[in-house]
Amino acid sequence: MRLAFWLYEGTALHGISRITNSMKGVHTVYHAPQGDDYITATYTMLERTPEFPALSISVVRGRDLAQGVSRLPATLQQVEHHYHPELTVIAPSCSTALLQEDLRQLAAHSGVAQEKLMVYAVNPFRVTENEAADGLFTELVKRYAANGQKSAVPAVNLLGFTSLGFHLKANLTSLRRMLSTLGVKVNVVAPWGAGIADLARLPEAWLNIAPYHEIGRTAAEYLEQEFAMPAVYDTPIGVEPTLRWLRSIIEKLNEVGAGCGASPISMPALHDFSLDGMSAPSGVPWFARTADMESFSNKKAFVFADATTTVAMVKFLRDELGMKVVGAGTYLERDADWVRRELEGYLPGELMVTDRFQDVAKVIEDELPDLVCGTQMERHSCRKLDIPCMVVSPPTHIENHLLGYYPFFGFDGADVIADRVYLSCKLGLEKHLIDFFGDAGLEYEDGDAADETGVAAAAANGHSPAGGSTEGEGGMVWTGEAETMLKKVPFFVRKKVRKNTETFAMEQGEGEVTVEVFRRAKDSLGG
């Protein structure tokens, strides 16, 4: 057993509550020890919605266990009286699993109508966030989806959008805009914003769209099997993937429409998808070919995220921005085979599959890429290494739950991602200029005073600031002149240059790094 902290995936409760908190008229009762309802704070802090999380806790106490009683029936009655939900989902905890409590039996004695209760008996020890969320959503679809008359006009369902989803609202807005441009109606978005009645209407649509591999795909497969509803599983991240996504939707809708005599849908002019209706829908194709972006072809990137994002970002960085992907990975072991198939030919080595952020940080430190696309964990790791990092996937923090329109999906999303890649790699240039040029002659007296203070401090410690030596991270000694030259290297690649120079010096049998050794290392490494 190892200490669990900084987890990439939350518990099964996280997944269950992401589904129920997304929906209208659905409530979760968590049968667990007091304190396990901390998850409500996550939603109130990050979600930025006026509603309080639809989650209550049925406390498991030692005294109750000793007396052979359970608070679950009373809690269910209180939830029914106070919230009047259409459905209450009862979620087990590790404690109830260890105690082997029969939640169905306890729920049956609550006095609440059984059709308004659902025990989602997932194993809390083995099942984590995404699997629990996908499983519960699929169970809800199986329970409530019903045969109905098909929509008279082309209509689709958007599946897998959940509470705490990455850039959720902006991604939905981007998809709605593109579908509206096609003349396609959105029948139901689920689970986000959907009620029980909306789940019943799912089969009325012509097509299901499930862009996330983690959540929604299984439900779409069930609807395809039971109601003969075709589905599109592609993720529209990037310009070319978005075009393929649109063509796939048009093709499948026209197949359905041909059976009911509907007029075929055709691809509109591309400028119709732009925000102003007049220009190209995305600036990425020409932006990637500008002189400024051409230099990105030599930059190295590392990606670590959930399955959907890892696949999409690796392809976007290489295919559309021309960057060199030196490695990629995911923390979702159950989706690793799918990621491997999707990224065949894209990676120089094996896909990294781990849920230990320390292992990911070690790879980043060894590779020293120019850009990392990852999670909140990689943001922290890269901050210590002075490596640019952009968060592209859960787990995230509050700065990734924005009020503005910053989608990752669609043409608009391609522009947002390209901007962030560019800024993440370029930000810090002003810091380098200050490092390089100093105060440029401004506030000269303060600069002299600071220099004198530094000289005095160095002398007091027995060091010679001008000609002294320092020891590098690898144990290699650097002369003062070599250190001064190293400081002229931009800070965001300085660590890499130091490491490469020390490696060169050791290979050449040098005992210390001098200016001459530094210059030879630079020439040898093509710098």
From Swiss-Prot:
Cofactor(s) recorded for this entry are:
[4Fe-4S] cluster
Question: At which positions is [4Fe-4S] cluster bound?
Answer: 36
- Active-site residues, record numbering mapped to chain: 292 (proton donor)
Top-rank taxon, per record: Bacteria
Spell out the InterPro entries in the cross-references: ChlB/BchB/BchZ (IPR050152), LI-POR_suB-like_C (IPR013580), Nase/OxRdtase_comp1 (IPR000510), P-CP_red_C (IPR042298), Protochl_reductB (IPR005969), Protochlorophyllide_Rdtase (IPR016209)
As its record notes, the protein acts as a catalyst of: chlorophyllide a + oxidized 2[4Fe-4S]-[ferredoxin] + 2 ADP + 2 phosphate = protochlorophyllide a + reduced 2[4Fe-4S]-[ferredoxin] + 2 ATP + 2 H2O
Keyword Transcription among UniProt keywords: no
Which sequence ranges form a coiled-coil region, renumbered to this chain?
none
Family membership, please give it: Belongs to the ChlB/BchB/BchZ family.
**Functional summary from the UniProt entry:** Component of the dark-operative protochlorophyllide reductase (DPOR) that uses Mg-ATP and reduced ferredoxin to reduce ring D of protochlorophyllide (Pchlide) to form chlorophyllide a (Chlide). This reaction is light-independent. The NB-protein (BchN-BchB) is the catalytic component of the complex.
- Record protein name field: Light-independent protochlorophyllide reductase subunit B
This protein's species is: Chlorobium phaeovibrioides (strain DSM 265 / 1930)
Q: Which gene encodes it?
A: bchB
